[in-house]
Curated annotation (Swiss-Prot):
Its main location: cytoplasm. Monomer. This is Translation initiation factor IF-3. The keyword Isomerase does not apply. One of its GO terms (cellular component) is membrane. It comes from the Bacteria. Coiled coil: none annotated. GO terms for molecular function: ribosome binding; translation initiation factor activity. Gene3D superfamilies: Translation initiation factor 3 (IF-3), C-terminal domain, Translation initiation factor 3 (IF-3), N-terminal domain. HAMAP family: IF_3. IF-3 binds to the 30S ribosomal subunit and shifts the equilibrium between 70S ribosomes and their 50S and 30S subunits in favor of the free subunits, thus enhancing the availability of 30S subunits on which protein synthesis initiation begins. GO terms for biological process: ribosome disassembly. Belongs to the IF-3 family.
């Protein structure tokens, strides 16, 4: 059953149809009833009559405690939002002529990002005439990928974009 916002559901006196297909508290079919009789049944049970499918012929109405239903629905939505994980892309910038110590520092940062579950975009910016030696940049990226292969997979291979070469790494998904 698709649940919609309050403004889309008609409750009790807001329902403006002659007869409805009535569904009971436990989900049992009570048949097609005139609206006044359905409202009386809901009032006797001290709960609400909610029109859940106005497009059906005849429209479907359910007897339920709307406040409790709304609370449960919001609780479910909140749980689903908690389960969603936000993946961010962190960037590590390198140079084609990077020194070993600097490379190790950048590598350590990249590994830290990957261990936290973030994706890492490794980029190399070519300045001046360095652009003529793209193979040096590709070699640096390959070295970075190889150094992180135990915790990451290459999501996007090295590619040029203007004066920049980049690749994207993603953490290896947990095997469950």
């Amino acid at each position: 059953m698709k649940i919609i916002a309050k403004k889309d559901l008609f409750i009790n006196d807001e329902i403006r149809v002659r007869e409805v297909r009535l569904v009971g508290l436990e989900g049992e079919q009570l048949g097609i009833k005139p609206l006044s009789e359905a409202q009386a049944i809901a009032d006797d049970a001290n709960v609400d009559l909610v029109l859940i499918q106005p497009q059906a012929t005849p429209p479907v109405a359910k007897i339920m405690d709307y406040g409790k239903f709304k609370f449960e629905y919001q609780k479910k939505q909140k749980e689903q939002r908690k389960k969603q994980s936000v993946v961010t892309v962190k960037e590590v910038r390198l140079s084609p002529v990077i020194d070993k110590g600097d490379f190790e520092t950048k590598l350590r940062n990249g590994r830290k990002f990957l261990e936290k579950g973030n994706k890492v975009k490794v980029s190399i910016r070519f300045k001046g005439r360095m652009i003529t030696h793209k193979e040096i940049g590709a070699k640096v990226l390959a070295e970075f990928a190889e150094a992180t292969q135990d915790i990451a997979i290459i999501e996007q291979r090295a590619k040029m974009d203007g004066r920049q070469m980049f690749m994207q790494l993603a953490p290896i998904p947990d095997k469950k």
